[in-house]
Amino acid sequence: MDDPRNVIDYYKYWKTDAIKADLDQKRHNFSVLISNKFTDFNIGSVIRNANAFLAREVFIYGRRQFDRRGTVGAHLYENLKVLREIEELSFPDSYVIGVDNIGEAKAIETYEWPKDKHVIMVFGQEDIGLTDELKAICKEFIYIKQYGSVRSLNVGCASAITMF
């Protein structure tokens, strides 16, 4: 019987816990925080991207519920943590970087990523970007330079570019 899960051939027929444990041994030194305060658009895509680029963990700030269909099963292999209150957004041992096209942000293509520090990339809501409470936890900000007429990328796309 064929394994119908959306996993690479290497992981076909492995148990879910075994896949997650194997990935945990290979993860990179960054995590992702995505806001789920108002809408859950693109959360599934962000989780899939976190899996593709081996993020250490994914923090979902706000509501616990989101449409898991968008993850195509990737949420099963990730270290997901739901943070419901602003007080939980404390990461003293990490370097927190907001991803948004705001005035003080630095261009991602020339940005010098912190060396030897655990980085948390913070992504806001699809329609409003980073809220003031999320901006308050960030040490600095980066943006993705664009050349067309639209002002922003969707969060799923921006997270893939940033994690890559």
Predicted regions mapped to residue ranges:
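Post-transcriptional modification and biogenesis factors for structured RNAs
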Residues: 1-164
